[in-house]
Amino acid sequence: MERRTFLKSAAAVSAFTILKPVTAFGTKANSAIRMGIIGCGGRGTGVISSISKNTNIVIIAMADLFDDKLQKALVTLNKVNSEKGYPEIQNTNMYKGSKAYLQLLNNKEVDAVLISTPAYAHPEFLEAAVAAGKHAYCEKPAAIDVEGCKRVQKIAAGIHGKLNAVHGFQIRYASPFIEMINRIQQGAIGDIVNVQLYYLSSGVGIGPINNMSFDEYRIRNHFHFHAISGGTLLDQGIHIRI
């Protein structure tokens, strides 16, 4: 499927459905879906690299609050593009600061975006992406509180099949897990009377404050601040519940 065909076909797809890898494959250089990434930390860089390896995209734009995140990710993403014969990301398509996401979304060359920021920003950034007419893959969770989730529901209701948008609950769409759930529901292992779940982790490290402001310190270490992360139960619950 060529890029233009994919973009036109979005009208036939319901809001917040998963985009299957085969949907994005193309056979010509100009058929690649042009993607931008909002939030260039380790998670975002890893996810968009994986998308590139499994689908026909070219990464053309980056946005982040911090320059060091941009520069570190740039090395990886230029390599990802190079491996597929695509050009490096232009300096003019690198956006830094609190309005960086809006600048990227205003880039007419961008077809779709990956939103991989701290969770508190997901509703706002997703809303802006949809308003800009961009297809979006937004990392989980949808939001950190009930009001944020209601906001996301409203965003989804307003898409009306015009865009492809999905949250990163990839386990829900993975064939092995779908088959497992189907077999359980069909009684393949009998009646389930008890389920026990265990999760062991060393936790997320917290960085030094150095000379940064408290706001910057809090955002860089957002997992340690419930007000902008939702807390451990939310962050881990979205991973271990299927």
What spans do the regions from the language model cover?
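Soluble or luminal CAZymes and related metallo-dependent hydrolases
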Residues: K69, K96, G148, R172, ...
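Glycine-rich phosphate-binding loop at the start of an alpha helix
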Residues: P123, V146, A174
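N-terminal glycine-/serine-/threonine-rich beta1-alpha1-beta2 phosphate-ribose binding loop
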Residues: M1-K134, R151-N164
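Predominantly a Rossmann-like dinucleotide-binding segment in NAD(P)-dependent oxidoreductases
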Residues: G39, G158-V166, I171-I242
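ADP-ribose/adenylate-binding Rossmann-like module
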Residues: G133-D145
